[in-house]
Amino acid sequence: MGITEQIEEAKRSDSLLLLVFYADWSPHYEWIEPLVHEFKKRVNIVRVNIEVNRKVADTYEIEIAPSFVLQRKDKVLWEKTGKLFPGELRDVIEMFKSWDPYIRMD
């Protein structure tokens, strides 16, 4: 299954989707895999090599690796470019896992 199909399949569920945009040459590449491994049971994760999958990167307006996009269905909830610490990602995931977009805050 290709990257686009993986993203579309993940967007059909109610689960959070974390897109991890990377480049093999990036000096940050080495710490991305442990991060992905830690969170793969909590959210759907799709890794996107920005050089190989330029069309997907362009869709999300990604220019720099690493970049991260957290979304549910078609709604982008959070974005980050650059170094990402596990605690930071953990907090963001927990916040949005408990967030219900259908609750009105009047």
What is each residue range found by the language model?
Residues P27-H28, V52-K55, G87:
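Short alpha-helical
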Residues V69-M105:
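Non-catalytic, surface beta->alpha helical segment in thiol-disulfide oxidoreductase systems
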